[in-house]
């Protein structure tokens, strides 16, 4: 009489382990890129928050306002998030009037200088994303950006 086989053979288990290894070889780098892209998006959110400050400063004809002074209620030119630090830079150019032209104001985002410095992806740590503000108030990625193109959020990528 023939006995029934119960369980898995060693070969079957080794094949399953090999398949899981192959899947992990593709999934882990893709997951790391996903994490870096999501952390890079925080910088653009910080820049959006600085739009109001830039608009207020433009009433005085400049991009940067006075430095932060909590005693007088001045909020300053920086905003710090979990993964990035965003800072207003640049010089206002009043001669630009077309909605798609840069107005001279920039927001420089430095990754790895946020409140969770040790928890940021190594793929974007120390990288900068420089956003040029257009006359219409929107941002595009500008010169001085050393963040890899695949991590720059689509909302600020220059359309090619």
UniProtKB/Swiss-Prot annotation:
Q: Tell me the keywords, alphabetical order.
A: Fimbrium, Membrane, Methylation, Transmembrane, Transmembrane helix
Stretches that traverse the bilayer: 8-28
Q: What protein name is recorded for this chain?
A: Fimbrial protein
The scientific name of the source species is: Dichelobacter nodosus (Bacteroides nodosus)
GO BP of this protein = cell adhesion
Q: What family does the database annotate?
A: Belongs to the N-Me-Phe pilin family.
Does the record's keyword annotation contain Transmembrane helix?
yes
What is the protein's major site of localization?
Answer: other
Give the UniProt subcellular location, in the record's own words.
Fimbrium; Membrane
Q: How does it assemble?
A: The pili are polar flexible filaments of about 5.4 nanometers diameter and 2.5 micrometers average length; they consist of only a single polypeptide chain arranged in a helical configuration of five subunits per turn in the assembled pilus.
- Residue ranges the record assigns to the propeptide: 1-7
Superkingdom field: Bacteria
Residues carrying N-methylphenylalanine = 8
């Amino acid at each position: 009489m023939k006995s029934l086989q119960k369980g898995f053979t060693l070969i079957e288990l080794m094949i399953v382990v090999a398949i899981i290894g192959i899947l992990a070889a593709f999934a882990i780098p893709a997951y790391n890129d996903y994490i870096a892209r999501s952390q890079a998006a925080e910088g653009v959110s910080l820049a959006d928050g600085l739009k109001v400050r830039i608009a207020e400063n433009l009433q005085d004809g400049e991009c940067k306002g006075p430095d932060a002074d909590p005693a007088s209620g001045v909020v300053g030119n920086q905003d710090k998030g979990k993964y990035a630090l965003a800072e207003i830079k640049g010089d206002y150019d009043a001669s630009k009037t077309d909605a798609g032209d840069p107005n001279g104001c920039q927001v420089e985002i430095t990754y790895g200088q946020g409140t969770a410095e040790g928890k940021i992806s190594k793929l974007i740590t120390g990288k900068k994303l420089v956003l040029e503000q257009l006359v219409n108030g929107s941002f595009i990625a500008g010169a001085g950006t050393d963040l890899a193109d695949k991590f720059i959020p689509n909302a600020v990528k220059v359309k090619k």
